[in-house]
Amino acid sequence: NRMRICKTFTFLSIFIVLFYNCSLPADDEDEGNPEEDNTTSELPWEGETDKFTINSKEGLRLNDPQENAGTAYVTIPSNSVKNTRWEFGVRLTFNPSANNYARFYLTSSSNVLSGNVNGYYIQIGGAKDNVALYRQNGEQPKLLASGREVMKGNNSPKLYIKVECDNNGYWTFWTRLESENEYTKEKQVKDNSIL
């Protein structure tokens, strides 16, 4: 059976603003501002859409009224993994911790993220206040690459993240704080275990 690949997003807290843009890598790369993207509200979102506000002005915003939010997610279907770029901006209105962080699934074997899935994701925060790339097999996450600790301090900054997977299974990710003019290449790692 062919694994269904979904670009997905999982959020483990309240009030996350996400500006989302996904495209194939271009030779003449345009480093435009992800905030200018107006396609977010037009994407075919699935999952717990009642917990999110989705519009072209704010992008995707977690709006779960529960005090103890737990896990909330929305997904969009896709067949692309290799030779693909994911690019998005995030503003967390909380200071991430070991128990309070955000996950953005780039690929997943299921559009239901509350169980066993195979896929790759970016995690913001956690035991370290960094951005990291993980592979998940079933319920077991494996850290593939860890970036700089950009989420330290009391105020969580606005952060832009770019991830690419090439045809050979090399994953590369970059980060850029709102105060920075250019992306910083964090890591590159080869992993095509579940591609």
Residue ranges and their predicted role:
Residues 17-47, 51-53:
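Bacterial Sec-dependent N-terminal signal peptides
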Residues 64-133:
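Secretory/extracellular carbohydrate-interaction modules
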Residues 1-20:
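Sec-dependent bacterial lipoprotein signal peptides
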Residues 50-70:
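Short carbohydrate-recognition loop motifs
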